[in-house]
């Protein structure tokens, strides 16, 4: 099984050395591998970006794409992220989207950080994903673990809010807050919930 990974380069797995994948539990419920491949086909996924701990899964899933007669998406396996104290923990969903949302992190702040994490390129506070996506080059991602810094994420979040247009946040602002008020308040906040202290 061969493919060219967008981060790791040419990959080769000998199927004779791989165990048969388990795709269904004894109770009839499906495990991740086959449903994920089917979803990718159904949704027209062209690129799969995930952690390097899934490289072996990719070899298995590529066989599934081939068996289903589907085009293979491109794969990029990035180095695993570390935190300020070493390995990141998934415990209690501390790094899940819901947790970031509850902390007032704007989706674009997370997208901006993740698009550059593991590269030498600076993280830019952007308010639209399309220009950022157009500049992603997987050849710039290193193989060494990248450090996820929540303080850096908070700073990017603030910078994004400082340049966010009124129209983009109007529905989320307190009733009666107009464009002039938003323009006066936005340089002073680090998350949208901070508006309440000014209005």
Task: Name what the model sees in each region.
Residues 56, 68-199:
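Catalytic adenosine-cofactor/nucleotide-binding cores of aminoacyl-tRNA synthetases and other
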Residues 1-77, 82-88, 96:
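Active-site cores that bind ATP or allylic diphosphates and position pyrophosphate for catalysis
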């Amino acid at each position: 099984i061969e493919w060219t990974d967008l981060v790791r380069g040419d990959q080769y797995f000998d199927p004779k050395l791989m165990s048969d994948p388990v795709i269904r539990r004894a109770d009839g419920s499906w495990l991740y591998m086959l449903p994920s491949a089917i979803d990718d086909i159904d949704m027209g996924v062209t690129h799969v970006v995930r952690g390097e701990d899934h490289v072996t899964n990719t070899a298995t899933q590529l066989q599934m794409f081939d068996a289903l007669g589907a085009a293979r998406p491109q794969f990029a396996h990035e180095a695993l992220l570390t935190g300020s104290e070493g390995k990141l923990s998934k415990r209690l969903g501390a790094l899940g989207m819901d947790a970031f949302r509850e902390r007032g992190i704007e989706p674009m702040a997370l997208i901006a950080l993740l698009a550059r994490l593991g590269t030498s390129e600076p993280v830019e506070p952007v308010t639209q994903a399309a220009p950022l996506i157009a500049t992603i080059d997987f050849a710039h991602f290193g193989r060494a673990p990248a450090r996820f810094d929540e303080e850096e994420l908070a700073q990017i979040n603030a910078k994004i809010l400082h340049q966010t247009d009124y129209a983009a946040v109007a529905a989320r602002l307190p009733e009666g807050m107009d464009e002039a008020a938003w323009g006066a308040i936005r340089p002073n906040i680090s998350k949208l919930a901070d508006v309440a202290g000014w209005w």
